[in-house]
Curated annotation (Swiss-Prot):
This is 4-hydroxy-3-methylbut-2-enyl diphosphate reductase. The keyword Cell membrane does not apply. InterPro entries: LytB/IspH. PANTHER family: 4-HYDROXY-3-METHYLBUT-2-ENYL DIPHOSPHATE REDUCTASE. It comes from the Bacteria. Pathway: Isoprenoid biosynthesis; dimethylallyl diphosphate biosynthesis; dimethylallyl diphosphate from (2E)-4-hydroxy-3-methylbutenyl diphosphate: step 1/1; Isoprenoid biosynthesis; isopentenyl diphosphate biosynthesis via DXP pathway; isopentenyl diphosphate from 1-deoxy-D-xylulose 5-phosphate: step 6/6. [4Fe-4S] cluster binds at residues 12, 96, 197. Signal peptide: none annotated. The gene is ispH. It catalyses: isopentenyl diphosphate + 2 oxidized [2Fe-2S]-[ferredoxin] + H2O = (2E)-4-hydroxy-3-methylbut-2-enyl diphosphate + 2 reduced [2Fe-2S]-[ferredoxin] + 2 H(+); dimethylallyl diphosphate + 2 oxidized [2Fe-2S]-[ferredoxin] + H2O = (2E)-4-hydroxy-3-methylbut-2-enyl diphosphate + 2 reduced [2Fe-2S]-[ferredoxin] + 2 H(+). Its EC number is 1.17.7.4. The active site is at residue 126. It comes from Aliivibrio fischeri (strain ATCC 700601 / ES114).
């Protein structure tokens, strides 16, 4: 049974930066370091940071006074930022710069009283943070997930409308929603550049290229990882039986029975160390040669905040 590795896969620049921020904070300041929400949606990563002294909370009221808090890569609302400032908490912001770009689009629209439609999944922390960038009382912000949601929209001024999207969505499904928005609201404006992040796009393209070459697809990622779920869904849509797993123990031998080629990819928050562990488990179930496909080269890099680049704490 041949093992075929997608390329690119795994960590993106935003995830690398977010994890580095927590690691540097733990190095420069005494534990505990508080992190609002899982810094990235990967159980393996979160457990490793917990062991080093990071404490993950869902709300700021769980952070004691006079402490450090890190905002996760998914971003936070303006209300959360305001609360942190009012409590004089020391904040390090691990929001992915590509999410910040979307936040800035919403904030600009809000200042101009332009209504905004966000394409995204209800309840996802990135969506909650992006919705929380809209401050205008004279216009509104709306969330849609599907083309059917667009038809139900009742905006105040169809001629004064802008759309943005969650960065980790399915490229194809987002395109369908955008097409419907433009059909229903011909004057709607969008971002100059697609909001879907480069890593999401690249990993979906890699799965699209690989799906027809394998009998079964293993996607390494946590159940709460949006981009990992989209990889599994895309592979299934392309006709390949696919599974999302969090660790080697999740892999079932019967999934691989009588298969000749198994594909392996990983969401943007899954580390290569975990991918390697799962490859070893596939080998234990009969995997032999490993072939890594060629793919789009990624050289994006996001720096950590300047305060965390210093060598010592003054």
């Amino acid at each position: 049974m041949k093992i075929v590795l997608a390329n690119p896969r795994g960590f993106c620049a935003g995830v690398d930066r977010a994890i580095s921020i927590v690691e540097r904070a733990l190095e420069l300041y005494e534990a505990p370091i508080y992190v609002r929400h899982e810094v990235v949606h990967n159980r393996f990563v979160v457990e490793g940071l917990k062991q080093r002294g990071a404490i993950f909370v869902e709300e700021l009221h769980e952070v004691p006074d006079d402490n450090i808090v890190i905002f996760s890569a998914h971003g936070v609302s303006q209300a959360v930022r305001k609360e942190a400032k009012e409590r004089a908490l020391t904040v390090f912001d691990a929001t992915c710069p590509l999410v910040t770009k979307v936040h800035m689009e919403v904030a600009r629209a809000s200042k101009k009283n332009i209504e905004v439609v966000l394409i995204g999944h209800a309840g996802h922390p990135e969506v909650e943070g992006t919705m929380g960038q809209y401050a205008s009382d004279s216009a509104g912000m709306y969330l849609v997930e599907t083309p059917d949601d667009v038809i139900k929209l009742n905006v105040k001024d169809p001629s004064n409308l802008h759309y943005v999207s969650q960065t980790t969505l399915s490229v194809d499904e987002t395109a369908d929603v955008i097409d419907e928005l433009r059909r229903v609201f011909p004057e709607i404006q969008g971002p100059r550049k697609d909001d879907i992040c480069y890593a999401t796009q690249n990993r979906q393209d890699a799965v699209r290229d690989m799906a027809s070459q394998v009998d079964v697809m293993i996607v390494v990622g946590s159940k709460n990882s949006s981009n990992s779920n989209r990889l599994r869904e895309l592979s299934e849509k392309l006709g390949t039986t696919s599974y999302l797993i969090d660790c080697p123990e999740d892999l079932k031998e019967e999934w691989l029975t009588e298969q000749t080629k198994v594909g392996v990819t990983a969401g943007a928050s899954a580390p290569e160390e975990l991918v390697n562990q799962i490859i070893e488990q596939v080998k234990a179930f009969g995997g032999t040669a490993v072939e890594e496909l060629t793919g789009r080269e990624e050289n994006m890099f996001f720096e950590v905040p300047k305060e965390l680049q210093i060598k010592t704490v003054s």
